[in-house]
């Protein structure tokens, strides 16, 4: 379907009904327009405390992974997620359990998963703590320990480090082999607003 957002890049591929014929049509269209798709993006909360929402998100993520293989992209960008009722340690344990079968499926199709570092705490339903725990090098290390897969890496977005007042260059050295995809966009820090409400 067509997205409701009013900026570019959000009209979606219907992964639920994608088959090899439709995938080939998309690839031919991209070739004709001289563009490539770097990744399929899907950003749900697969650690949601609502187990029905969690299952729905995981089921669709599996379809996105399959579509990425059909389209010969072999990369999906997403969030690890967060259960807002749990602390970070318990969320890490939950992530290990929830993501293991997702990664096994991705590996079976030769599709890599790149986790974005956006905290997702911008709206009332995302507060407090946001909907994604994978926001910092300290947490990445723990995730990669619990999920030691060559198919799990990062969709690195330096803008989220900037507004959190973190060094966005330093992680590039330690995690260079885990950076599968990069989001580039501009950012402006509103210092007056930050002085009023802080970075969280």
Segments predicted by a language model, with ranges:
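Acidic/histidine-rich catalytic cores of soluble enzymes
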Residues: 40, 90, 96-200
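Flexible loop residues that form catalytic
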Residues: 1-3, 45, 81, 118, ...
């Amino acid at each position: 379907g067509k997205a409701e957002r009013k900026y570019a890049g959000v009209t979606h591929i219907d992964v639920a009904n994608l088959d090899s014929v439709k995938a080939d049509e998309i690839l031919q269209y991209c070739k004709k327009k001289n563009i490539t798709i770097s990744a399929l993006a899907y950003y749900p909360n697969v650690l949601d405390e609502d187990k029905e929402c969690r299952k729905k998100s995981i089921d669709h993520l599996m379809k996105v992974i399959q579509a990425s293989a059909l389209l010969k992209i072999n990369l999906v960008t997403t969030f690890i997620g967060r259960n807002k009722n749990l602390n970070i340690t318990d969320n890490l344990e939950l992530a290990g359990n929830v993501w293991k079968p997702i990664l096994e499926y991705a590996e079976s199709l030769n599709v890599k998963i790149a986790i974005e570092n956006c905290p997702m705490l911008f709206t009332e339903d995302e507060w407090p703590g946001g909907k994604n725990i994978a926001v910092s090098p300290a947490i990445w290390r723990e995730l990669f320990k619990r999920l030691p897969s060559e198919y799990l890496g990062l969709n690195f977005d330096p803008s989220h480090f900037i507004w959190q007042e973190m060094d966005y260059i330093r992680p590039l050295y330690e995690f260079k082999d885990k950076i599968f995809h990069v989001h580039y966009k501009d950012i402006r820090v509103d210092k007056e607003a930050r002085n009023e409400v802080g970075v969280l």
